[in-house]
Every structure is written in C-alpha cells, then in structure tokens.
Amino acid sequence: MAIPTETQHQEKEASDASAAAAQKRWTLSDFDIGKPLGRGKFGHVYLAREKRSNHVVALKVLFKSQLQQSQVEHQLRREVEIQSHLRHPNILRLYGYFYDQKRVYLILEYAARGELYKDLQKCKYFSERRAATYVASLARALIYCHGKHVIHRDIKPENLLIGAQGELKIADFGWSVHTFNRRRTMCGTLDYLPPEMVESVEHDASVDIWSLGILCYEFLYGVPPFEAMEHSDTYRRIVQVDLKFPPKPIISASAKDLISQMLVKESSQRLPLHKLLEHPWIVQNADPSGIYRV
C-alpha cells in the first residue's frame, strides 16, 4: 500500500529528529518552548520546536526532586531505555533526553489531537467502528512490543494519545518491562489488572491481552467491566472474571464474543493477538488504515 506523501514527510522529519538526537547532547536552549500540553505527577509537558530543524515535539519536563521523593528514578530510566528503541506507527516516539541540575527533559513525538481519555469522556463511549479500529491498532503495536520482549503492563485510556491523522499512539511506558521470563510484581491500574497480577502470581505478555480486552469493553460501554465501589470488590470481580454486559448501549454479539475470549482467567487460554486481528468483529469494523476519521 502506497504511503501518502504527507506521511512520508512526517516520517522523514521524525527520522531526522531521531538521528540528530543520537548525535548531539541537547540543552534547553536548543528549543523554543510553547504552550503547556498537560501536567502530571512529576512535571509538565510543553509544545516545543527544535530551533535548528524546526521540528515540533512535545517536551516532557520532570523534576528530579519529585522523582527521588517517589523513588521512581529506576522506573524512568527503564521507560527511557525501552521507549527510545521502539519504532512503530502506534507507539509514541521518544527522540532523546537531556537533564540539568533540577530537571530531566524527554523529547517526545507530538500527538496533535491529544489525549484519547478526553475524547472518551466527551463521547461517553465509542462506536463499534471506532473501538475496533483502535483495538486493532493496539494489537499490532503490542505484537511488535512482544516481539521485542517488551510487556507494557499498563494499557489504559489515560496512556493513549491521538496523532494528527487520527492514529492511536501508546504514550506511557512507565510500567513496561524488557523481559525474557515471567515476573511477579504488581503494577498498572487496578481496573485493568489481570487475575494473575491481583493474586501476585507469575505473569507474562498475556497480561497485555487482558488489558486490551478491558480497554475494548470500556471503549464500548464507557466504564471498565469490573468496576466497583470498593477496591476489595473490584479485586474479587477480577479474580472471578465476573463479566457482565449491560443492556445499554446495544453492542453486537460479535464484540461481546471477542471481549469474552480476551478476558479469560487462565492466561494461556486468552485469544492471541494475531488471532484477534482475524476475529470477525475486527475484520468487519476496523478501518484497515488504522486511522479513525471522525
């Protein structure tokens, strides 16, 4: 399939920025800083332009003192190490990083249409066509990650951005691991945790299949499937896979079938990601371009 000229231009810009990042040591004076794009627990994200190339990026500014207080320096180093080596259209690029006495700066790809979470809040829930397009895009990105021995472990709406063309981008690799074996640590977001992580037993890449199933449900219904008033009830519902499909909104049997095949307690029995892409609901609803056009 031919790539549009605009996409080629964007990819060349991204490639140039990445090559430049690898060749030099950045400082804040290399950038014109623009409007704030968002704020997080450890700092802020700004729109920025690299002066020499005129390339527009998102500059994530993190305060060292806050990272140290929360003991997440190791997590940040891991995020930088993993994300800087990933090259996929549905994964936000990390071009490089630099630091000064007080702050750490991450030079990130700019996703012009912003946070998916805000879109979901505004719409309440997505159409099956939109949900399927996003789920298929994420499945392809996760297949790529798993092929590189990277497990994300924290797929959720808050960690997804939308690019200028409407393509989905995985944006946060703070909980991801580069692994060749099974792990036992608990991480990620409660509503999205699979049974094996709730029960603190070994887990592998199939945790991302579970999280993608939760995400698909939330796209279609507007809430995660095991949500409850008390944490203990959420834990119980996850472990028992207490999966219920409300009567409203009306969702196709095919969509429910896909979700049911992903949200399986025995991790080895979850629908593999390559099979997900062949599922009738994905085939019939997902835009093959991976781009949802509003």
Curated annotation (Swiss-Prot):
Q: How is it modified after translation?
A: Phosphorylation at Thr-185 may regulate activity and degradation of AUR1 in a cell cycle dependent manner.
InterPro entries assigned: Aur-like (IPR030616), Kinase-like_dom_sf (IPR011009), Prot_kinase_dom (IPR000719), Protein_kinase_ATP_BS (IPR017441), Ser/Thr_kinase_AS (IPR008271)
- Top-level enzyme category: transferase
Is ATP-binding one of the keywords? Answer: yes
> PROSITE patterns, from UniProt?
PROTEIN_KINASE_ATP, PROTEIN_KINASE_DOM, PROTEIN_KINASE_ST
Modified residue annotations for Phosphothreonine: 185
Q: Which residues form the signal peptide?
A: none
The UniProt entry, under SMART domains, shows:
S_TKc
Which Pfam families does the record associate with it? Pkinase
UniProt keywords (A-Z) are: ATP-binding, Cell cycle, Cell division, Cytoplasm, Cytoskeleton, Kinase, Membrane, Microtubule, Mitosis, Nucleotide-binding, Nucleus, Phosphoprotein, Serine/threonine-protein kinase, Transferase
Q: Which CDD domains match?
A: STKc_Aurora
Tissue and organ expression note: Abundant in roots, flowers and flower buds, low or absent in expanded leaves, stems and siliques.
Q: Which GO terms describe its molecular function?
A: ATP binding; histone H3S10 kinase activity; protein serine kinase activity; protein serine/threonine kinase activity
Annotated Protein kinase domain ranges read: 31-282
What does the record give as the active site? 154
Q: Which family does it belong to?
A: Belongs to the protein kinase superfamily. Ser/Thr protein kinase family. Aurora subfamily.
General function of this protein: Phosphorylates specifically 'Ser-10' of histone H3 in vitro and colocalizes with phosphorylated histone H3 during mitosis. Associates with cytoskeletal structures that are necessary for cytokinesis and with the microtubule spindle. Also colocalizes with gamma-tubulin and function in microtubule organizing centers (MTOCs). In contrast with the mammalian B-type Aurora, AUR1 has no kinase activity toward 'Ser-28' of histone H3.
Under what name is this protein listed?
Answer: Serine/threonine-protein kinase Aurora-1
This chain's source organism reads: Arabidopsis thaliana
